[in-house]
Swiss-Prot record:
Gene that this sequence comes from: xseB
Lineage: Bacteria, Pseudomonadati, Pseudomonadota, Alphaproteobacteria, Rickettsiales
Top enzyme class: hydrolase
NCBIfam families, alphabetized: PRK00977.1-3, PRK00977.1-4, xseB
GO cellular component labels: cytosol; exodeoxyribonuclease VII complex
Annotated protein name in UniProt: Exodeoxyribonuclease 7 small subunit
The enzyme's E.C. designation: 3.1.11.6
Catalytic reaction(s) noted: Exonucleolytic cleavage in either 5'- to 3'- or 3'- to 5'-direction to yield nucleoside 5'-phosphates
Length: 80
């Protein structure tokens, strides 16, 4: 786990989500020192933002595909 201010550009949604889940478990279980927990929290925020970005990109791509396939705009509310 890297605690840099940026996230690796090539990390997949699934990898980011898995790491985020692991961070949440460690923080919830109190398995880390305060300093490590704060660093993990910071990393978790980066991972959350990355996952949200990937989901938004996927939603936009689906909307574009739907528009092209039907030649009409079909926007449906998607739950995240």
């Amino acid at each position: 786990m890297t605690n840099t201010k940026t996230l690796e550009a090539n990390i997949s949604f699934e990898e980011a989500l898995k790491e985020l889940e692991e961070i949440v478990k460690k923080i919830d279980n109190g398995q880390e020192s305060l300093e490590t927990a704060v660093n993990s929290f910071e990393r978790g925020i980066l991972l959350k933002n990355h996952c949200e970005k990937k989901l938004k990109e996927a939603r936009l791509k689906i909307e574009k595909i739907t528009k092209l396939a039907d030649s009409t705009v079909v926007l449906e509310e998607m739950e995240v």
